[in-house]
């Protein structure tokens, strides 16, 4: 089940962006996942180092003298090495998954393009109506702006009383346009869901490209990923042992020294 969900997210992540954003340069699913993971890891790494630095420069940190920053930098170096080792392995996993789902992604892309072509006139009409409303609103505001410049409105309350009906009118018109657009697009949204259901049902009936096969292939790729990542994870564990041992020794030594100072007072 998890593998099927992974495939579904992978497919939609590959294609849904192009439904509304054709002008952006294409980006592979792996690039998006890698960018997200890199930003997250770097954020955690930077914020974690800041916390360690703040503690080490505090009064208690100076008394304990744990050399946390040295240990943190060693840990960061080890983790970066792990990321470099796993890079080709995870890239191979995504390449295999992309290859296995190529046909299904092409069909989904075709469906999305067809639905987009059908709804585009409604979107264009909505944009046209909205622009007309904004132009009309601007025209109605022009006399108020002129009065304000000429000093005819002495109080801000007078201006607010004149603007409120216009603002309410624009809000009501905008709501009406949005509701109309929602009503117009509803059948196409249902059609897209139906097409997706049809594609998935076809997968179930087609022994050559069934969901069970995708599940098995995804599980196989995940298993291969785990096997190839095992040496790198073992290296990480071996690299962490000296860091943890150094931290343990420093902490116990600092604690013992701190206890002696308290006893002597």
Curated annotation (Swiss-Prot):
Signal sequence extent: 1-16
UniProt GO BP: adrenal gland development; amyloid-beta formation; blood vessel endothelial cell migration; cellular response to lipoprotein particle stimulus; cholesterol biosynthetic process; cholesterol efflux; cholesterol homeostasis; cholesterol import
GO molecular-function term, one example from the UniProt record: enzyme binding
Keyword tags: Cholesterol metabolism, HDL, Lipid metabolism, Lipid transport, Lipoprotein, Oxidation, Palmitate, Phosphoprotein, Repeat, Secreted, Signal, Steroid metabolism, Sterol metabolism, Transport
Coiled coil: none
Region called 10 X approximate tandem repeats, residue ranges: 66-265
Modification(s) after translation: Glycosylated.
Residue positions where Methionine sulfoxide is found in the record: 108, 134
Compartments, record wording: Secreted
Transmembrane segments: none
InterPro entries: ApoA_E, Apolipoprotein_A1/A4/E
GO cellular component entries: chylomicron; endocytic vesicle; extracellular vesicle; low-density lipoprotein particle; spherical high-density lipoprotein particle; very-low-density lipoprotein particle
Sequence repeat residue intervals: 66-87, 88-109, 110-120, 121-142, 143-164, 165-186, 187-208, 209-230, 231-241, 242-265
UniProt record similarity statement: Belongs to the apolipoprotein A1/A4/E family.
Function: Participates in the reverse transport of cholesterol from tissues to the liver for excretion by promoting cholesterol efflux from tissues and by acting as a cofactor for the lecithin cholesterol acyltransferase (LCAT). As part of the SPAP complex, activates spermatozoa motility.
Subunit architecture: Homodimer. Interacts with APOA1BP and CLU. Component of a sperm activating protein complex (SPAP), consisting of APOA1, an immunoglobulin heavy chain, an immunoglobulin light chain and albumin. Interacts with NDRG1. Interacts with SCGB3A2. Interacts with NAXE and YJEFN3.
Protein name as annotated: Apolipoprotein A-I
Gene: APOA1
């Amino acid at each position: 089940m998890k593998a099927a969900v992974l495939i579904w997210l992978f497919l939609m992540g590959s294609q849904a962006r192009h439904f509304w954003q054709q002008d952006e340069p294409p980006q592979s699913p792996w690039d998006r996942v890698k960018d997200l993971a890199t930003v997250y890891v770097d954020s955690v790494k930077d914020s974690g180092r800041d916390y360690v630095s703040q503690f080490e420069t505090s009064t208690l940190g100076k008394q304990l003298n744990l050399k946390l920053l040295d240990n943190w930098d060693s840990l960061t170096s080890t983790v970066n090495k792990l990321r470099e080792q796993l890079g080709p392995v995870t890239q191979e996993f995504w390449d295999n998954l992309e290859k296995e789902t190529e046909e299904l992604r092409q069909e989904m892309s075709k469906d999305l393009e067809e639905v987009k072509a059908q709804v585009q006139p409604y979107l264009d009409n909505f944009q046209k109506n909205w622009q007309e409303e904004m132009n009309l609103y601007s025209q109605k505001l022009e006399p108020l702006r002129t009065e304000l410049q000429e000093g005819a409105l002495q109080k801000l309350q007078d201006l607010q009383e004149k603007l409120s009906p216009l603002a309410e009118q624009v809000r009501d018109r905008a709501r009406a346009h949005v509701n109309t657009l929602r009503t117009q697009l509803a059948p196409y949204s249902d059609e897209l869901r139906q097409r997706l259901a049809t594609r998935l049902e076809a997968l179930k009936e087609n022994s050559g490209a069934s969901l069970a096969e995708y599940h098995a292939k995804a599980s196989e790729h995940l298993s291969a990923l785990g096997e190839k990542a095992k040496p790198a994870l073992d290296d990480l564990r071996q690299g962490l042992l000296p860091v943890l041992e150094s931290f343990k020794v420093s902490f116990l030594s600092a604690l013992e020294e701190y206890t002696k100072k308290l006893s002597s007072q």
